[in-house]
Design a protein with these regions (language model features):
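Generic structural detector for well-ordered beta-strands
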Residues: 58, 120-122, 163
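Generic structural hydrophobic/aromatic packing signal, biased to beta-strands
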Residues: 72-74, 117-119, 143-145
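N-terminal signal-anchor transmembrane alpha helix of single-pass membrane proteins
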Residues: 1-35
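Short Pro-Gly-centered flexible turn/kink motifs
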Residues: 110-122
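Acidic, serine/threonine- and proline-rich intrinsically disordered appendage/tail regions
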Residues: 2-4, 29, 93-102, 107-110, ...
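N-terminal topogenic membrane-targeting module
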Residues: 22-113
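Short, surface-exposed loop/turn segments at beta-strand-coil junctions that are enriched for proline
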Residues: 122-132
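Hydrophobic alpha-helical segments
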Residues: 74-75, 134-136
């Protein structure tokens, strides 16, 4: 009986090692979100009480296998304790495929190809009903872009952070920051 268990264990070890060798030879997907190279933010819309901004981030598959981006979302990092003048709404969407429900539909990235993801940020005035007046006191706005991706390996979650500075926001809103 011990002999059979030993044989089964050796077979499992050999299969595991063989799988590792195959993955190394065949390769895998390497997903690279190039957040640090995002396009400059632009104004999509400005109203009395809000401003909508967007930027585009390239996501490249630099590996040898197809990758799946299963989810991508934006987490704004502006607590009310730091600045309570605006409510921040942020989302990610595949370029050219806008969705009203804020759902990010899974997308394949073939080997050695890339896609563009649009990051949309809306700043809504919470107090004065005048976004330009409120933004004169705005602080830097960190944004975490989180994506879940998979290929031959088990799924992974990756996060990149970009910062929308108060100076950028002031320039886009055509205002001057308060001292």
């Amino acid at each position: 009986m011990d002999f059979i268990i030993t044989i089964i264990l050796w077979i499992l070890i050999i299969l595991f090692l063989l799988n590792e060798v195959i993955i190394r030879v065949v390769g895998d997907a390497i997903v690279n979100m190039k957040a640090s190279e995002h396009t400059p933010f632009t104004v999509d819309e400005i109203t009395q009480d809000s401003i909508s901004l967007s930027t585009t981030i390239n996501v490249a598959n630099e590996g040898k296998q197809c990758a799946t981006i299963m989810d991508c979302y934006v987490r704004q990092l502006l607590p009310y304790e730091q600045f309570d003048g605006v409510k921040v709404e942020a989302k990610a969407e595949l370029k050219g495929v806008p969705r009203e429900d804020d759902y990010f539909e899974a997308v394949l990235i073939q080997k050695k190809e890339s896609i563009d993801i649009v990051i949309r940020v809306k700043l809504i005035d919470r107090k004065n009903n005048d976004i330009k007046q409120t933004l004169t006191h705005m602080v830097d706005l960190p944004l975490d872009i989180v994506n879940q991706h998979a290929a031959r390996y088990p799924w992974k979650i990756s996060k990149e952070t970009i910062v929308l500075t108060s100076e950028e926001i002031a320039k886009l809103a055509d205002i001057k920051l308060a001292d």
